[in-house]
Amino acid sequence: TPEIAMRIQRTLGSNIQMVLDECTHYPASKDEALLSMKRSEQWALRSFESYQDLKQDSDSAIFGIIQGGMYGDLRLENLDYLSSINFDGLAIGGLSVGETINERMEVLEQLMPAMPKSMPRYLMGLGTPLDIISAVDVGVDMFDCVIQTRHARNGQIYTHRGVLRIKNAQYKDDLRPIDEDCNCYSCNNFSRSYIRHLFNCNEILGSRLATIHNISFYLGLMANIREAITTNSFEK
């Protein structure tokens, strides 16, 4: 229930607490998306009321989650409803669930101009570096995704020159770091050849080193995006 969800987040000490919502499946008819959205609206209000009851002196924040499937009018209707509740920020849910990039961007391009500029705007469940850059370009501020760790466990490593699949035979004798433009712990201390060896031996250190690098790469990506926005050079 929304009340249990908020109580768990309060117990965990979550800095940003999310309302309980229903992620609309894809593809969904408009009637299905509307029914799911209305359920999420009811849960959003109950979550907010429970959060207020539990908040006490906590420094936490609560975000609403915008649903509505791939239907721009439903998204805007849901945004209007959530904006009437005193949330600290708004998240965009129900994307990165199997839709095409064009469908996703169409939803974002309809939704983002209507979102309050005074609130953080958080896109849930995205994504690749290109996905993130495209979403920032239309006004998204925050992201979360498991791709950095999930892909690392499978030997897919992000670099400034594209994805490196470390298990491939071409890296057997490659003594270079994963990414010569990276200063993370993995790149400073281990070669591609050694990390490939760890993966081939099913040694957990391999996935840990790949994870450290992928997370470092994404932190650097976001830092570069922030700097580009600050210096008015993002479009370059």
What are these regions (language model features)?
Residues 1-87, 97:
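Active-site entrance/lid segments in N-terminal catalytic domains of soluble metabolic enzymes
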Residues 54-178:
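Glycine-rich phosphate/ribose-binding loops and adjacent secondary-structure elements
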Residues 40-47, 82, 108-111, 218, ...:
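Hydrophobic alpha-helical packing residues
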Residues 21-27, 179-236:
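C-terminal extensions of enzymes
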Residues 35, 42, 73, 102, ...:
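Conserved active-site and cofactor/substrate-binding residues in soluble primary-metabolism enzymes
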Residues 7, 130-133, 141, 193, ...:
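Active-site phosphate/pyrophosphate-handling residues
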